[in-house]
Structure formats: C-alpha cells, structure tokens
C-alpha cells in the first residue's frame, strides 16, 4: 500500500468521479465495481465486494454529521461536495410523496392565510376517511426503479426508526396522511416474521463484510511476511558471502 495515499480522501474522490450513488439502478452496481477496482489498485487492498466501500461511505456520512473535527480540510471539502450532489434524505418521487408535500404546503398557506369558515375545517378534520381512497390509490403506484432494493422494502430503513420513537411520533410525522400510511405499512408489510427475516439478513450482511475485511487483512499480513522472509534470506546470503571472503585459506590451498 502506498503510504502517501489517504484512503478516505481517495474513496471520496472516486465517488465524486464515478458517482455510483447517483446512477440508476441498472448501472449502479457496475459503477461501484469500478470504484472498488480503482480503490484496490491505488491502496493495495484486496476487497472483493463493493459492499465494503458502501459501508465505509455510510459510516463517513454518519461521522460527518456527528463530529466534523475528525476530518481534514481537504476531506471536509470533498465530503461537502458529495452531500451537496446527493442529499441524505431525498424527496420521494411517488404520488404519495407529491401529495404529502402539497398537503404540507397547503397547510402552511392556510396558517398564514386563515379562511373565513373555521368550522368547515374542523368538520373536515373530524372525518379523515374522505381521503382513504386517495391514500389507497397512491399506495398502489409503482416505485421508481432506482429506489427498489431486492428483498427489502425501499422504506424499511426509515420506518422502524420512526416507529421506535414512541413519544416523538407526533413531532416527527405531522401529516395525518403520513400517519395513516405508516400505520397501515407497519401492520401489513412488517409482520413479526418479516421483522425477524430482516434482522437475520442484516446480521448476515454484517458477517459477510467482516469476513471480507478479515480476508483482506490476512492477505496483507501474508504479503508482509513473505517480504520479510525474502529480506532476511537476502541478508543471510550477503553475510555468508562476507564470511567466505574473510575465512583464512586452508593447508590444501597453500600447497
């Protein structure tokens, strides 16, 4: 491995160059593979799966949000450029997301411009079933191709985090449509069996990453051991040659 190469800065530069996190689903894996090959070539690593670099990038984003003092100025600049290109929480492009954004904008407009009849708004709030058909229709819309993850629902990473905050649900989710959609999703899409399968899948993924990391470390240690043995043998050969030159001639040589 070249000591002058900063692995973090190299990874960020490769992500800016190839942009695998911004590519459509059909081209994303190939782009990540190019990043992996270039990263292994310049750092001397032997990572076999691009998932390892994805995990590194996710942890860098978490560390960037928690403590930016851990980054150098050049790393901060590259990380800021990456986050500007790809927001951490992009707005969904489904019909449900459009309806929720429009409902939020309309609610802010109503707060700044109150209508003449508040009783009509109160009656509409007491009967939320009028929009149930809209919610069901929006839930049947297909998701965009680049947000589909094989075997795991695309919102699986966000919904458990929201549902785990029992006291802050009302603060995090303000729209009644989002509340109803989240409850319906948790009742139908995340039964206990699927939650157990998700936990097993996450554990298996972490295990594969750890095994890949250990394999790479063992390969590096093996290479260092071979280099060390080669250097020792070369030095022994030099010492043997010097000793043979310093050895006095025998009686047979004098005769």
Swiss-Prot record:
The keyword Zinc-finger appears for this protein: no
Disulphides: none
Source organism, top-level taxon: Eukaryota
Residue span of region Disordered: 87-149
Keyword field: Activator, Transcription, Transcription regulation
GO molecular function, one term: sequence-specific DNA binding
Any one GO biological process: allantoin catabolic process
GO cellular component, as recorded: nucleus
Keyword Transcription appears in the UniProt entry: yes
Residue ranges, compositional bias (Basic and acidic residues): 128-138
Protein task: Positive regulator of allophanate-induced genes in S.cerevisiae.
Entry protein name: Protein DAL82
